[in-house]
């Protein structure tokens, strides 16, 4: 007898506006509970201090979350000059206080040095792992371990405001970029130290900012459904973005349903007009039903890489 699954097979991406003070995983678990979803996963953690866009993949969409992990991000950050902390943000302890002698011209010149591709050494207070343990666990024990620098790209970094000891910036960057580290490095470059006091992620990939919803929004809809004796999915599911929204930047290969059936059974197929190489987004029929992500094999065929498993709500 098949084991009954806990939750329902809901598929899609919900753009959560994460509040400050809770972890990304706590946010994920709340969304999973509200949607009563079988599976859920987020697409790149935000610090507890940070707020903003946290795409959460539900159901089959979790298979494609890596593409969002690898996508560009946008942030709004406020930094305080004159104080350096052990975490590079206001959640940490002040370890050094220095006088601030910085003018706007000097600040803008230093900020400009972060544009482009550079090497960044991740903060000890990060979720990256060393010998199987997150770096922040070592940091809390007062242990510093070696970290390899990583290539990051800052596509743009703009100074929005400079008042007193406060600096506000907007950053568009590649995956794996630590805004706290940029802020700490900026403070050292200026000779006065700095740390993050406010951080908001305003963009992931091409997802629209206005489509974000809060946990409170979802809880209110859940309560409304209970009051009106309606199925919660009637109010909650319309907020979901399609699961292939995570891979919208990939070239599409549309195929007739007969070929799609072969692909869904693990067989590569020849599709007229497909790219000659690379990763592709596969769709079926005139309705362009998303069936998964594939790649072009050595024979020029479209071969499955990650496939959607289709199940009805009643099949739980």
From Swiss-Prot:
Its EC number is 5.4.99.25. It catalyses: uridine(55) in tRNA = pseudouridine(55) in tRNA. The keyword Mitochondrion does not apply. Keywords: Isomerase, tRNA processing. It comes from the Bacteria. The active site is at 47 (nucleophile). One of its GO terms (biological process) is mRNA pseudouridine synthesis. GO terms for molecular function: RNA binding; tRNA pseudouridine(55) synthase activity. InterPro entries: PsdUridine_synth_cat_dom_sf, PsdUridine_synth_N, PUA-like_sf, PUA_sf, tRNA_psdUridine_synth_TruB, tRNA_sdUridine_synth_fam1_C, TruB_C. Belongs to the pseudouridine synthase TruB family. Type 1 subfamily. Responsible for synthesis of pseudouridine from uracil-55 in the psi GC loop of transfer RNAs. HAMAP family: TruB_bact. This is tRNA pseudouridine synthase B. The lineage of its organism: Bacteria, Pseudomonadati, Pseudomonadota, Gammaproteobacteria, Vibrionales.
